[in-house]
């Protein structure tokens, strides 16, 4: 298995107010500082009549927020390369946003795929996992 990074997503449920875009930029900066990652660029877009997206391009990957005020949801995404743990963002986000619930998903980004392969039928998915295993068996061990 070749791991390239860690990825978390948070769905922040039950938000009742629409936050100013500057709040998200400050939170991204706080998360970047806590995770010890480098922000290269921040891009944002305000939708009409509501909603907002902000993404920070990092030297180590990205952080993003997408808001859905009409549904009371803020979606957060943090993908990091190397040994950086994106979970440092969780406590910051819990403190910064009013919410009733947060759904966290975390996973490694790697070559070992036991997830749904969108290009294969169920029968071929199993073949895909077997082929991947055979590739790793045939590769010389790296030390």
Residue ranges of each PLM-predicted region?
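Conserved small/polar residues in nucleotide/adenosyl-binding loops
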Residues: 135-141
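Mature, function-bearing regions of proteins
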Residues: 1-58, 67-134
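Catalytic micro-motifs at enzyme active sites that drive phosphoryl/nucleotidyl and oxygen chemistry
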Residues: 64
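Ser/Thr-centric signal marking residues that sit
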Residues: 80, 141-142
């Amino acid at each position: 298995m070749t791991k390239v990074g860690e990825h978390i997503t948070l769905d922040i449920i039950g938000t009742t107010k629409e936050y100013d875009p500057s709040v998200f930029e400050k939170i991204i900066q706080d998360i970047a500082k806590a995770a010890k990652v480098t922000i290269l660029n921040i891009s944002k877009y305000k939708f009409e009549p509501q909603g907002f997206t902000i993404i920070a391009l990092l030297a180590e990957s990205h952080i993003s927020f997408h808001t859905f005020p009409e549904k009371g949801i803020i979606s957060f995404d943090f993908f990091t390369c190397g040994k950086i743990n994106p979970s440092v963002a969780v406590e910051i986000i819990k403190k910064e946003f009013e919410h009733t619930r947060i759904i966290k998903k975390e996973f490694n980004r790697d070559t070992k795929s036991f997830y749904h392969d969108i290009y294969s039928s169920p029968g071929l998915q199993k073949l895909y996992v077997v082929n991947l295993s055979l590739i790793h068996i045939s590769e010389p061990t790296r030390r």
